[in-house]
C-alpha cells in the first residue's frame, strides 16, 4: 500500500494522501461518522459503510496487538513478560494531544495480555489509558531501547531519530511505515 501511495503522490494535482496506521484518534474523527449515521437512520438512509468502518476501527487495537505478538513470537518471545516500548501516544504527529489515541488502546490490550508496557512521547509526559493505567514517558536512550524486547512505532513524530531507534532496538513493529530499511527485526 505504501508503494501505491508514493506512486499516486506523483500526480501533479488533485491528490490528497491518506496514510494507514494503527487506528483513528482525536476528538472528532472517531465520533462524528456515528452522529451522521444516527441522523441518516432517522431519514431511512442506509450508511452501512460507516457502520462497517466503525467496526473495523474498533477492532484495530486487537489487530495491532496481534502484529506485536506475531513479531515477538518470530523472535521466540511471548508477550507475557516481554518489555514493550511504545513510541508516541499522541493521536497524530508533533502534537501534545492523546485524546482517543489508538496507541493507548493498543497499550491497554498489550498490558492486559501481561506485557510489560512503557512509552516515550516527546510531547506527552504522562498518560492515563481508558482502563485507568497511568504511565510516565520514559527517556529515549540507547539503554532503554536495548532493554526493550519490542519497540512499537505508534506515532510518527518528526523528533524520532529512526536511525538511532533502529540501531539500538532488538525488534521493531512499525505501525507508521517510518523505518525505510528491511530486516528480520522490523515488522
Q: Which functions belong to the PLM regions below?
A:
Residues 1-187:
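Structural/interface elements that position substrates and couple domains in central-metabolism enzymes
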Amino acid at each position: 500500500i505504501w508503494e501505491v501511495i508514493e506512486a499516486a503522490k506523483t500526480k501533479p494535482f488533485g491528490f490528497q494522501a491518506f496514510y494507514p496506521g494503527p487506528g483513528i484518534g482525536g476528538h472528532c474523527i472517531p465520533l462524528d461518522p456515528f452522529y451522521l449515521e444516527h441522523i441518516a437512520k432517522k431519514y431511512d438512509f442506509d450508511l452501512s459503510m460507516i457502520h462497517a468502518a466503525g467496526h473495523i476501527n474498533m477492532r484495530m487495537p486487537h489487530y495491532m496487538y496481534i502484529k506485536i505478538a506475531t513479531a515477538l513470537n518470530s523472535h521466540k518471545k511471548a508477550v507475557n513478560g516481554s518489555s514493550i516500548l511504545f513510541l508516541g501516544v499522541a493521536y497524530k504527529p508533533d502534537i501534545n494531544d492523546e485524546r482517543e489515541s489508538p496507541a493507548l488502546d493498543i497499550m491497554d490490550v498489550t498490558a492486559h495480555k501481561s506485557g510489560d508496557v512503557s512509552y516515550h512521547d516527546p510531547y506527552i509526559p504522562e498518560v492515563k489509558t481508558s482502563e485507568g493505567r497511568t504511565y510516565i514517558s520514559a527517556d529515549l536512550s540507547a539503554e532503554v531501547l536495548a532493554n526493550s524486547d519490542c519497540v512499537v512505532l505508534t506515532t510518527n513524530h518528526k523528533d524520532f531519530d529512526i536511525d538511532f531507534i533502529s540501531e539500538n532496538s532488538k525488534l521493531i513493529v512499525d505501525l507508521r511505515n517510518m523505518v525505510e530499511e528491511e530486516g528480520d527485526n522490523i515488522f
